Amino acid sequence: MLEGWSVVIDYTASSRPFGMARLLTRYGFRVDRIYADTISPEEEDTIAFLKERCPHILVCPTVHHKMAVLPRGLYEESGGRVLAIGQKAAYFTGTPHFVNMVEDGGLYGCGGILELAGLMQEAAMEEKDTGKLIQVKGWGCFC
């Protein structure tokens, strides 16, 4: 279902975004970006794993001032096959295909992994109205 899709993850979706990336890459998903401003000491081994086995993954800050003006073209560049996990990842890539999840969404263990897989499949099949779901968070609101 998600073969050929690029997956991007942000730190608001998971307390351990690098661990999520490791899990997904081990099961054949192509994770291309992780949006995170800090790296938890608990994830140092995971970072080493990703550097060795997935050197193509970009780690992008979300609070850097240039992030507000960078083009959001990954979605178009990838032929519309970008799946984001988290609202910030959806915003920065411009994709309408995203898992709208915050702080792991209550998912845990094997059941949580299976539920995440279902949410990813659902996000790939159905576009969300990104502008409505991600309102004031830098979307260009003139409030």
Regions found by a protein language model. Name each.
Residues M1-C143:
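An N-terminal assembly and electron-transfer interface module characteristic of large anaerobic redox
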